[in-house]
């Protein structure tokens, strides 16, 4: 997989579903990174539904992961000790914020009220391709985060590149 790249403005449909942008959907609908055991029944009852992992991120966004990427994250979490209070807390916080969503034949996923409330999304949203994941933001919240941190970009880029 080449990775998810780009940004698109979208709106929820009347049932609170998000249409995954076609350019992102192409990568996983073809089956990239999705193995046979990662397929579940689609919401229309077909046997070829693809699912994604949806997570509430600490910054107020939502993140979508394909199964193969999530499995790598899960391996890292499995290495944490349940007997170390910090590590146990991290695992609890991550798993509490996680759900599995099925992509229907039209490329839509349901977003529950819990997830919409976390992200502050009412109708409009921005989907950002961030290589191994898709990040979903409420547009004004994203604009505020970017504006508030605009001066940090050069320093951060200089530190990590």
From Swiss-Prot:
SpoVT-AbrB domain segment(s): 7-69, 98-141
Location (main, coarse): cytoplasm
Subcellular location as annotated: Cytoplasm, Nucleoid
GO cellular component, one term: nucleoid
Membrane spanning residue stretches: none
GO terms (BP aspect): negative regulation of DNA-templated transcription initiation
Disulfide bonds: none
UniProt keyword annotation of Transmembrane present: no
Alphabetized GO MF terms: DNA-binding transcription factor activity; transcription cis-regulatory region binding
UniProtKB keywords: Cytoplasm, DNA-binding, Repeat, Transcription, Transcription regulation
Gene3D superfamilies in the record: Transcriptional regulator MraZ domain
Binding partners and assembly: Forms oligomers.
Family: Belongs to the MraZ family.
UniProt-listed PANTHER family: TRANSCRIPTIONAL REGULATOR MRAZ (PTHR34701:SF1)
Protein name, per record: Transcriptional regulator MraZ
């Amino acid at each position: 997989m080449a990775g998810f790249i780009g940004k698109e403005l979208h709106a929820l449909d009347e049932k609170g579903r998000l249409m995954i942008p076609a350019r992102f959907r192409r990568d996983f609908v073809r089956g990239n990174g999705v193995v046979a055991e990662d397929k579940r029944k689609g919401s229309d009852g077909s046997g070829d539904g693809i699912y994604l992992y949806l997570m509430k991120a600490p910054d107020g966004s939502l993140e979508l992961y394909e199964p193969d990427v999530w499995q790598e994250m899960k391996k890292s979490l499995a290495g944490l000790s349940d007997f170390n209070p910090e590590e146990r807390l991290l695992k609890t916080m991550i798993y509490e914020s996680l759900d599995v969503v099925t992509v229907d034949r039209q490329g839509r996923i349901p977003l529950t009220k819990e997830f919409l409330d976390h992200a502050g999304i009412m109708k409009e949203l921005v989907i950002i391709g961030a290589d191994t994941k898709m990040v979903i933001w409420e547009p004004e919240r994203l604009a505020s985060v970017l504006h508030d941190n605009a001066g940090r970009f050069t320093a951060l880029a200089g530190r990590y590149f």
